[in-house]
Curated annotation (Swiss-Prot):
It comes from the Bacteria. It is found in: Cell membrane. Keywords: Cell membrane, Lipoprotein, Membrane, Palmitate, Signal. It is a lipid-anchor. This is Uncharacterized lipoprotein in plc 3'region. Its main location: membrane.
Length: 256
């Protein structure tokens, strides 16, 4: 009887040890993911995008010796009301630190499904450039609404603030060392600063508070290969989606 009790106690102790180790690994990986994103998110907000010409980023062997790199920033808002198309509006801008010039495009998309249920991409792009911190079209645009949207567009990096990132707790952590890929998801409230900023700038048709998703691929300690994206997911279900995504990263320049 005593031996059985001792074995039971030993088994329970080992179980608690395994759980503790697993929990510790999860906490450690969460801290690593946060640290990896903090390198970039600590730069937010950058009200004057031209400041990026003088900002350093992570560099590795993928960069030529004399290449300062190109910052690529993107932000998009996607809204799909129940039973309707997924409507997306966003912008991509590449700031070349060598030439101190920036160009990109504003885009709109309405993704619908055809008769066979396959999504049909209908993206329209409007080329833009940045001059004196102002984004302007490089070709004539007849649609006044599109022109106004481009004129008023702001990237999250210009108004977002992640100083409270370290305070986000109990995230849903995922890590695959083989890819490698990683993510951390946190439930936010509508009182969160960035959520308020998004609601201020976009007509978001839900009162649900979003989840913040930090996701990336490549070496957690830093890599110019792969990506790091952040996403605010308000609604995610079949036939109905509302999310905002954003990214900022330094890549080797295509034209030096």
């Amino acid at each position: 009887m005593i031996k059985r009790v001792n074995k039971l106690v030993l088994g329970i102790s080992l179980l608690f040890l395994v759980i503790s180790i697993a929990a510790g690994c999860g906490i450690g990986k969460e801290a690593e993911i946060k640290k990896s994103f903090e390198k970039t998110l600590s730069m937010y907000p950058i009200k004057n995008l031209e400041d990026l010409y003088d900002k350093e980023g992570y560099r590795d062997d993928e960069f030529d010796k004399n290449d300062k790199g190109t910052w690529t920033i993107s932000s998009e808002m996607a809204i799909q009301k129940k039973g309707e198309a997924l409507n997306i509006k966003g912008m991509v801008l590449k700031l070349n630190r060598n030439t101190r010039s920036a160009k990109g495009f504003y885009y709109v998309n309405a993704i619908k499904k055809d008769e066979d249920g396959r999504p049909q991409d209908n993206q329209i792009e409007y080329p833009v450039k940045m001059v004196d911190n102002k984004i302007i079209p490089t070709k004539e645009i007849k649609d006044d609404n599109i022109k106004k949207e481009i004129e008023n567009f702001k990237f999250l990096v210009q108004y977002g603030n992640f100083k409270d990132l370290s305070k986000y707790k109990d995230g849903d952590i995922s890590y695959n060392p083989e890819v490698p890929s990683y993510s951390a998801k946190y439930q936010l409230t509508n009182d969160d600063y960035n959520v308020k900023q998004l609601r201020k700038r976009y007509n978001i048709p839900t009162n649900k508070a979003p989840k913040l998703l930090l996701k990336g691929t490549g070496n957690l300690k830093g890599s110019s290969v792969g990506y790091k994206d952040i996403e605010f997911t308000f609604v995610e279900k079949k036939g109905e989606n509302i999310y905002f995504s954003d990214s900022l990263h330094l890549k080797p320049s295509e034209d030096k």
